[in-house]
Amino acid sequence: MSERSFDVIVIGGGHNGLTTANYLAMGALRVCVLERRHIIGGAAISEEFHPGFRNSIASYVVSLLRPEVVSELELEKYGYEPILLENSFYPDSNGDYLLLTGSEAHNQAQYAKFSNSDYEALKEYYGYVEKVGEIVASQWLKTPPPLSGAGVNDLLNTVQIGMDMLKLDKQEKHRMLQFFVGAPISIIDSWFDSAKVKAMIAASCTPANYASLHQPGAAMAMLHHAVGEVHGKKGAWGLVKGGMGSITKAMAASAQTKGVSIRTNSAVSRILVSDSSAIGVELESGEKIYAKAIAANTDPKTTFLKMLGEDHLPRRFARDISAIRQESASLRMNLALSGLPQFACLPSDGPGEHHRAGIMFVESVEHIEQAYRAARAGVPATPPFIDALIPSVVDDSLTDEPGTHVMSLLCKYMPYELSGGKDWDTEKERVSEDIINYLTKMIPNLREILVGYQCLTPLDLERDFGLPRGDICHGRLEPDQLFSARPHPDAAQYQTPMKGLYLCGSGAHPGGGVTGAPGRNAAKQILKNWKK
């Protein structure tokens, strides 16, 4: 067994781990990234899922990736090419739809099909979302202040947050409070009249969420559109040419030019400890690698309770970590299609604006709530709410044959644990068929053009990508699991109770999504401590 030594070992080659490695290398540290899978990228990868068809296998949209990370790591130089998705399409099984584009006149006419007032209400609503979202976004690339024993920089950061909030007027402060601690349905009902628009807004807060629309505190997810941007356009979402793996490939290439060592097929079994300090890791192969610091891109429960072990942690801290709520009730499907999906509500001879859109198959607010309640009872939602894309319409590099397509589906709500003693390995095919049958109501030619599919259940997301209970955020995004409490007040500044061990993944502030923010922030903290 070989023994090697580095300044820092990064556990996990996902986008945050690679981000951390880049910034540490920029600080002249010797860094080794250890990835357990055969490919780097974590959940942000592109792979062939059916012969001749490639796609973003897990993470599938870009918006939250911080512009600072893109520019500082020169990702575009290494192949990162975002594609703006300006359109949104909301079809339902009754034949109704909303199709929103870059044309204000077009959008006003679309909303007028359902309401005489919601268009103006939406403009005012999105104004508040943007204002509050700016305050949230301003904290993403900052280390959250500790809840006690704050230093001068922490106090200044807290003062700045207060100053930002003071700039808001009375109405803006009221809306901010609603977003931070309110229930989505209360906000939605207070703003909008039509069932269609209410469903559209409700759908926007579900992809990374696992909460009732009636749950106080669940409205934080409604701010995600304001925090993101593509090509400088606030609130926009997009695709990446070649799939999300192009992001992590660019990050890896950037890191390797800085001298970072990246190893795949190198699963870490435990973190080595000596004299109350983390000193290295042991791989499943038995190989030991040593370092002065460890940055864990794994989720907090895996990091602390499995790799480190409760014996090396304060008892109360370990109990708190074990109580972190993890689960997003998400199921991913990738469809291989021999032709273009034809929507019953909007047939077309070729790709239309609705094909170049983020597509949300949602019936109503009640549909979303019923899906949530079913999942809570351990039953896959029938039908699920589905967030979809047809990325091959704007990126023909994803398929080998002209005219063929891939379709991405994020299906909600799908519980990690099934009731009645059922398990996902036996239920996967049945649930997949139920999803396809539901989509066929709106895409009549789907069965005809479907040549294959990949289904990743919550259990698959855990096994394949290390997402605990299928949680795409490493821990639910709820008020008591955010900011200075993410994942715990004693680890919210990326340092942990174990000397030399840091967190750099989505389980740390500011949370999930392909942002690069936890990775960048953790690296800054490690470098700051390195100089002491």
PLM regions with names:
Residues 384-480:
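FAD-dependent oxidoreductase catalytic-site/capping-region signature
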